[in-house]
């Protein structure tokens, strides 16, 4: 049995689907703060609870759990700056609570979602590999890194094995264009409504956009990775201006973007070195144009606009 925290969320629900496709039994733990009931796979068991609940073991039978895939988190960078206590409560104390349940019930493996976009900070060199210095620019980046360190500590103290996946910018179906969504779903949402999206700064800032299906596949493979920290991205950088052009072309949008002042605390250029993931047998399969086409179709068909 695999426990997926945040399994009703954007990335977590794709992981659940991939596990069930591969005949795993799955329990979803999600408090539906940002998760969505519509994302829940009917073949999974669903528990509506919070990773911070001290009585989690009264709600979930941890004796049946062999692996935890820990996706539940506070993921809003700007929220973390405005409310670092809330961010730390979920991302640090919530993670410790999950680790304590694992220790108590002898669960020997965790796969953890970390952030390649947030833990490294402003890159010293590109592409950014796993040995790049850690220098977060936000409480979110720091809380993700502290989560990593607690997991490594529990490995040293109690022998709990881990795979830590540092995601780049994940996009795909089920990403909510409201709130702290990725730029791709926000741009698509705007252009499908025939509205001009806002680009903060000059639009030359770059990101590494990885498709959610590829990320789900990485989590499945990570069940067999032992005590590894691995970047999960594409190894390619795409500017926000290039992204706008790709989406504009896919949708047939006739307007232009609106440029606004840059946001504080955001990295200017980043993309990840994925050689380690490739050496472990994982590589991204869906390129950006194909991925965007899928998201546009999904948003049209699901009335998310």
UniProtKB/Swiss-Prot annotation:
Q: Where does NAD(+) bind?
A: 10-11, 30-35, 50-51, 71-75, 140, 144
User: Organism's domain of life?
Assistant: Archaea
Enzyme nomenclature, EC number: 5.1.3.2
For this UniProt entry, which segments traverse the membrane? none
Select a single GO molecular function from the record's annotations and give it: UDP-glucose 4-epimerase activity
Give one GO biological process term. Answer: galactose metabolic process
Catalytic reaction equation(s): UDP-alpha-D-glucose = UDP-alpha-D-galactose
The active site lies at 140 (proton acceptor)
Tell me which stretches of the chain form a coiled coil. none
Residues where substrate binds: 115, 140, 169, 183-184, 198-200, 207, 263-266
Cofactors named for this entry? NAD(+)
Top-level EC class: isomerase
Pathway where it operates: Carbohydrate metabolism; galactose metabolism
Q: Which UniProt keywords apply?
A: Carbohydrate metabolism, Galactose metabolism, Isomerase, NAD
Q: Record's InterPro entries?
A: Epimerase_deHydtase, NAD(P)-bd_dom_sf
Q: What does this protein do?
A: Involved in the metabolism of galactose. Catalyzes the conversion of UDP-galactose (UDP-Gal) to UDP-glucose (UDP-Glc) through a mechanism involving the transient reduction of NAD.
Q: Which family does it belong to?
A: Belongs to the NAD(P)-dependent epimerase/dehydratase family.
Please report the name of this protein according to its UniProt entry. Answer: Putative UDP-glucose 4-epimerase
Protein source organism: Methanocaldococcus jannaschii (strain ATCC 43067 / DSM 2661 / JAL-1 / JCM 10045 / NBRC 100440)
Taxonomic classification? Archaea, Methanobacteriati, Methanobacteriota, Methanomada group, Methanococci
